[in-house]
Amino acid sequence: MTGLLNGKVVAITGGVTGIGRAIAIEMARNGAKVVVNHLPSEEQAQLAKELKEEISDGENNVLTIPGDISLPETGRRIVELAVEKFGEINVFVSNAGVCGFREFLEITPETLFQTVNINLNGAFFAIQAAAQQMVKQGKGGSIIGISSISALVGGAHQTHYTPTKAGILSLMQSTACALGKYGIRCNAILPGTISTALNEEDLKDPEKRKYMEGRIPLGRVGDPKDIAGPAIFLASDMSNYVNGAQLLVDGGLFVNLQ
């Protein structure tokens, strides 16, 4: 198979559901060898098996790795196993994240710490591990952080979540400065309202869905596949001079003030 990512090895955290899954599928279709991290559970293992069956090209182009991304050692393990399997890593997509809607006055320390550890701390250590390997290889690379429109605006029921996504955006900007001298590009994608498990309950409510769609100039909520295209662009050589950028993928939601 040939494509925009032919010959590249890509690792994705949180890659068996939602946005991560869509990115994994489309990157494989564009010729990449794909390493997919997922939570160590029976359900996620089954999803990983199904994903592998869907995108495998018969040439052993997919590796799935269970692991809790909130643990610093998980990022290192993903990179180590990716290199052991495919010899190198060229693209790293930090996607794993959680978002349970909560009233600010009722958020417990446990909920906050879990959200920060998964969404931000885990991303930091995984990105660091990927960058260390890319520097060792001496061939540059591309690191993509999946942030959110929530990095730019507030959310009454997301006070534990929005700071982590703002943190991802800031992390990608700072790593762009820190790693540019090694030829490693770091960029953020900021999805708007995307139909995933994170907002499944909200989108089941006809009134809430109508309200959400009414605020989006394109008139629909996004599909996970809508994020895959921008991710492929940032992973590919077409974006060789794109570094420290934030790519808002929201159907026009952010700019619609009326």
UniProtKB/Swiss-Prot annotation:
For biological process, the GO terms are: fatty acid biosynthetic process; rhamnose catabolic process
The family line of this record is:
Belongs to the short-chain dehydrogenases/reductases (SDR) family.
Q: Which molecular-function annotations from GO does this UniProt entry contain? A: L-rhamnose 1-dehydrogenase activity; NADH dehydrogenase activity; quinone binding
Q: What does this protein do?
A: NAD-dependent dehydrogenase that has high activity with L-rhamnose and L-lyxose, and shows only low activity with L-mannose. Has no activity with NADP. Catalyzes the first step in an alternative pathway for rhamnose utilization that does not involve phosphorylated intermediates.
Which residues bind NADP(+) per the record? 19, 68, 95, 161, 165, 194, 196
Give the signal sequence positions. Answer: none
Gene coding for it? DHG2
Which reaction is catalysed here?
L-rhamnofuranose + NAD(+) = L-rhamnono-1,4-lactone + NADH + H(+)
Superkingdom assignment: Eukaryota
Q: What induces it?
A: Up-regulated by growth on rhamnose.
Q: Which UniProt keywords apply?
A: NADP, Oxidoreductase, Rhamnose metabolism
Q: One matching Pfam family, short form? A: adh_short_C2
| Active site (UniProt) | 147 (proton donor), 161 (proton donor), 165 (lowers pka of active site tyr)
Stated pH dependence = Optimum pH is 9.5.
User: Which top class of enzyme applies to this chain?
Assistant: oxidoreductase
The miscellaneous comment for this protein is:
Part of gene cluster that contains the genes for this rhamnose catabolic pathway.
What's the protein called, per UniProt?
L-rhamnose-1-dehydrogenase
Q: Give the Enzyme Commission number.
A: 1.1.1.173
